[in-house]
């Protein structure tokens, strides 16, 4: 049947990007475009719920914002989930963010989802699903303890 992890992103405890994982496979990631009109500091929480059926360890995450590497910290690691956090500073009107476990160009073109977040108008949209079934939850109502960002 193949591996299927679950991958979600929580932004500032207010927006959840759900089901960002691929339908099958050991990779997870997405491309984000964030529009804002002034400086913003956003706290990201990356939640991976691994499928241990065919793997021994979970791949790490790499994050780039406008081609600059973002420091990602692993904050929790249990059998049921692995949580990473990062702070991303938005200086430009448009910020492109790449989040991935594997940066193969083909994955961004045809597999990882592409999501647009307009922080000015509060319009959030899945632009391309590709090989995933993502959806956006706003406002976020955390239903797991590790989803709240205190």
Curated annotation (Swiss-Prot):
One of its GO terms (biological process) is symbiont-mediated suppression of host innate immune response. Belongs to the orthopoxvirus OPG027 family. It comes from Vaccinia virus (strain Ankara) (VACV). InterPro entries: Poxvirus_C7/F8A. This is Interferon antagonist OPG027. Induction: Expressed in the early phase of the viral replicative cycle. Inhibits antiviral activity induced by type I interferons. Does not block signal transduction of IFN, but is important to counteract the host antiviral state induced by a pre-treatment with IFN. Pfam families: Pox_C7_F8A. Signal peptide: none annotated. Keywords: Early protein, Host-virus interaction, Inhibition of host innate immune response by virus, Viral immunoevasion.
